[in-house]
Amino acid sequence: MNIKTAVGAAFLGILWSSSMAFAFDTASKAPVGQSKRFFASEFGKTLPPVGYVQFCATNPEECKPRGGKKFKLAMSPERWNLIYQVNTYVNGKIAPVSDQDLYGEPERWVYPTDAGDCEDYLLLKKRYLEGLGFPPEALLITVVLDESNGGHAVLTVTTDGGDFILDNRRNDVLRWSDTNYTFLKRQSHSNPTQWLALVKQPTSNSGFVSGGTSR
């Protein structure tokens, strides 16, 4: 059993012991002719965040090319339940603390144990979901600008009903177009070290992810 499988099994134990439940959203399927609203457009290659490059240097096994094409996960009540529970559990488990306060540096991406910045939350959520059998091609680290034009990182789950966002600032799992964020870039489905722009024009704020600790 590898570490991700073990982590997923451990999370299932937590989930079952707490007897939590989440109702399946039957309206999550994208209506015919409206798919542009539910799926983010990609505009070619761009540079990854500095912190992610450093993360891959220390965790090369997490950043290996996967191959394959774009992946849209077929959703079910069970998968929705797991996505919601992972998001809620990690949001409650990890205290929001900036990298500057934790490590004395502006950005460091790590798997958190009890405290972390926005990117640390999503790394742990991604690890849990992969351990629960979710394909990594459907779990994409994503950089956005929030309502205050500050850098922030979230986890995108690409599904047959749209691109959904796991965010440390909310427990609700929303479609990307319902978040009020400006989406800048995210990982490629086939190679996590290659990033794709989600805006036509490059943004100077997209190199670092900061200000993502607030709820």
What residue spans do the PLM features occupy?
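Bacterial N-terminal signal peptides that target proteins for export
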Residues: 1-8
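Bacterial N-terminal signal peptides
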Residues: 9-17
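A structural boundary/capping signal
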Residues: 21-215
